[in-house]
Amino acid sequence: MNKVVVKNVTFGEGAPKICVPMVGKTVAALKEEAEMLKTIDLDVVEWRVDFYEDVKDLAKVETALDEIRVVLPETPILFTFRSAKEGGELAVSDEFYFELNETLARTGKIDLVDVELFNEEADVLRLIETAHKHDVKVVMSNHDFDKTPAKEEIVSRLTRMEALGADLPKIAVMPKSATDVLTLLDATNTVSEKADQPIITMSMAGTGVISRLAGEVFGSAMTFGAAKKASAPGQIDVNELRHVLDLLHKQF
């Protein structure tokens, strides 16, 4: 399996890396969040820009990013606009979604960009090309807040992401039972054994918490923890998350 190196973080080896979302609505709130995150043992910060009140002003988005970078100069930043159709805060046009992500990728000030799989393939490929040209890694994602698809479908989506050029394919699904969690873990194990790229998977809500902890066993390279406000159901406090991941890593 290929390793994906972003600043001082290597995906695809050791314990799953911890990513913590920033969900501030204003620059002041984002700076405050960044100052807090600076004191926490994490690997990646995800800026959930769909929470930012001036997201439709690209110049203000870049200025906000600059302010975050002042506080977190060496921390890998994952730039994510989560669309409303995949559980995000704001509905925007496809045109704006791609313009925003391409513009920020071109700045070279982000390390990773989230690209949702279920878009026009030509747009997705263009964004991947732009990101890679500016040394930005691509987390390609899909979120199902209603259900857990069949194992074959989860495998198919992750495999498709890799085929399109994702550096880190990612899927998050909602379990209705413990069996659904096992389906996600089984699919993760199957894909990670044959994939060229590290993958990121999770089963959401309380039922799925085990999937956020067991990535090193089943083959998920990153997990999401909460420092202030969870951006998805089931996220665990980052300090507790680190403790459990370290415990499992020592035994593995």
Curated annotation (Swiss-Prot):
HAMAP family: AroD (MF_00214). Signal peptide: none annotated. Keywords: Amino-acid biosynthesis, Aromatic amino acid biosynthesis, Lyase, Schiff base. It catalyses: 3-dehydroquinate = 3-dehydroshikimate + H2O. Belongs to the type-I 3-dehydroquinase family. Its EC number is 4.2.1.10. The keyword Amino-acid biosynthesis applies. It comes from Listeria welshimeri serovar 6b (strain ATCC 35897 / DSM 20650 / CCUG 15529 / CIP 8149 / NCTC 11857 / SLCC 5334 / V8). This is 3-dehydroquinate dehydratase. Involved in the third step of the chorismate pathway, which leads to the biosynthesis of aromatic amino acids. Catalyzes the cis-dehydration of 3-dehydroquinate (DHQ) and introduces the first double bond of the aromatic ring to yield 3-dehydroshikimate.
